[in-house]
Design a protein with these regions (language model features):
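Bacterial N-terminal signal peptides that target proteins for export
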Residues: 2-20
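C-terminal motif of bacterial Sec signal peptides marking the signal peptidase cleavage site
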Residues: 27-30
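A structural "domain/chain start" motif
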Residues: 32-112, 224-226
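Surface-exposed short loop/turn segments
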Residues: 34-52, 125-178
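Soluble periplasmic/extracytoplasmic beta-strand elements of cell-envelope proteins
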Residues: 69-74, 87-89, 144-148, 165-171, ...
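Short secondary-structure boundary motifs at beta->alpha junctions and helix caps
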Residues: 97-104, 176-219
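Extracellular-facing segments of soluble proteins and assemblies that are Gly/Ser/Thr-biased and enriched
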Residues: 108, 112-136
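Sec-exported extracytoplasmic/periplasmic mature domains
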Residues: 119, 123-127, 154, 218-226
Length: 226
């Protein structure tokens, strides 16, 4: 009798164990699929101008000449900045290493975001052209603004404090006899504090740094009467 009960209990135990094992596998698989399906947060510089009206600003003197039309070339960037990752550095540990946030992405490459923001600002006061746009016959060759994005990251001085750091090399050139003549060049380096030690704080700081850099570039171009 005991042997018979044992023979009946053994298959039942094995069946129960297999059922529990399958439930465990299904649960773990579901958790893994849920974790892998979490999409990273997508960031840009915000909606930009919300009105077509010019912002209130000091009027230009009547005798001031019109600003030259300007070609804004595609911004060149180092290979590390060609992707969409939101990058940071730990200056207190290894400042030479760029690291990406796992769950944060730019909506497009940083160089494209910077160019878009630059055109939005400069276009308020002058005619902007794209590379390859034609100009009227007899007109002087338009000036070209070239930019190289060398740094665009959140730099942590400590685990709790950081800044958005942007570094741009800006060059103004003009076509001359099938070549380009450099008219002016400068380096623009801007940093703005991050309000929080995370990707969202870094994005806001880099947006502020970009806007400040663009203001600096615009003011510089006007001092050159370009």
């Amino acid at each position: 009798m005991t042997n018979a009960m044992h023979l009946i209990a053994t298959p039942a135990y094995k069946t129960c164990a297999r059922g529990l094992f399958l439930i465990l596998i299904i649960t773990l698989t579901g958790c893994a699929l849920k974790a892998s399906s979490v999409s990273p947060s997508l960031y840009d510089f915000g909606p930009g101008r919300l009105s077509s009206r010019a912002e209130a600003a000091p009027a230009r003197a009547p005798q001031a000449p019109a600003l030259h039309p300007l070609i804004v070339a595609d911004i060149e960037a180092s290979p590390a900045l060609e992707g969409n990752a939101v990058l940071y550095r730990l200056a207190y540990a290894d400042a030479q290493q760029l690291k990406p946030y796992a769950q944060a992405r730019w909506s497009m490459a940083p160089a494209q975001l910077v160019r878009q923001r630059l055109r939005e600002h400069l276009g308020q006061s002058r005619t902007l052209l794209n590379p390859g746009d034609s100009v009227g016959q007899g007109s002087a060759a338009p000036l070209t603004l070239r930019l190289e994005l060398e740094e665009f990251s959140q730099l942590f001085d400590t685990p709790a404090t950081s800044v958005g750091l942007l570094r741009l090399r800006v060059t103004v050139v003009q076509a001359h006899n099938a070549s380009e003549q450099t008219l002016a060049q400068r380096m623009v380096v801007v940093q703005r504090p991050a309000a929080s030690a995370d990707a969202a704080g870094g994005v806001r700081a880099l947006t502020a740094a970009t806007d400040a850099a663009i203001q600096e570039i615009d003011a510089w171009l006007q001092t050159l009467a370009l």
